[in-house]
Amino acid sequence: MQLAYFHVAADVPQGAEPDAAVVIDVLRATTTIAWALNNGAEAVETFADLDQLRQSAAQWPESSRLMLGERGGQRIEGFDLGNSPVAVVPEQVAGKRLFMSTTNGTRSLQRVRGVQRLFTLALPNRRAVADHLLMDPPEQLWIVGSGWEGAYSLEDSLAAGALADLLLNAAADEACVVNDELTAALALWQQWKHDPEACLRQASHGQRLIGLGDHDADFRCCAELDRLSVVPVQVKPGVLCAS
């Protein structure tokens, strides 16, 4: 299993495709996706374009859909929810299709949506995703961060290192790191693994969220390691369901 990490969607190689890909947006899209599916959402359908989201959502009955999204860390006007993992509680999302667009995470999902096996990862479902991959190891795995508006993000690299650490320890001689980005992410994980929430708060996007208001509950939720058993898997382009 060859493991590579790409900081943002634009870093993903053109004209190549791995056996599997994992998309990360720790603050907060992939954490919200994991919790929504864990709490009974029928599916999460992701969009980079807001007009396409609204058109697709309009085809569903209002009683069985929710529109989730943020731009610049704040909820999009007219949407039901923003991008907070603590808001997707069972009484809100159970049985519903969630139509979601975020500043960064949905762009990375769109970039690799053609990969045959596509998953999303957050710190709360890290072990679940690792175990799922190890049951049928891909020959080549791309880990794709979301960053912030095309730039590197500390928290996504932390999660990439956290996932790679599990895979490398479990697969022993059958897994290897193939780029420097993942080597750096592994070192970052070793530095912060005993206090991931502190890393999230120190990250520039963490500082951005702090500036927008009280997000303490979000930070705790996003940093909670290996809490969930849900594995979000793409079942058709842009549509994620629980596995």
Curated annotation (Swiss-Prot):
Gene3D superfamilies: ComB-like. Its EC number is 3.1.3.71. Pfam families: 2-ph_phosp. SUPFAM superfamilies: ComB-like. It catalyses: (2R)-O-phospho-3-sulfolactate + H2O = (2R)-3-sulfolactate + phosphate. GO terms for molecular function: 2-phosphosulfolactate phosphatase activity; magnesium ion binding; sulfopyruvate decarboxylase activity. InterPro entries: ComB-like, ComB-like_sf. Its cofactor is Mg(2+). It comes from the Bacteria. Keywords: Hydrolase, Magnesium. Belongs to the ComB family. HAMAP family: ComB. This is Probable 2-phosphosulfolactate phosphatase. It comes from Prochlorococcus marinus (strain MIT 9303). The gene is comB.
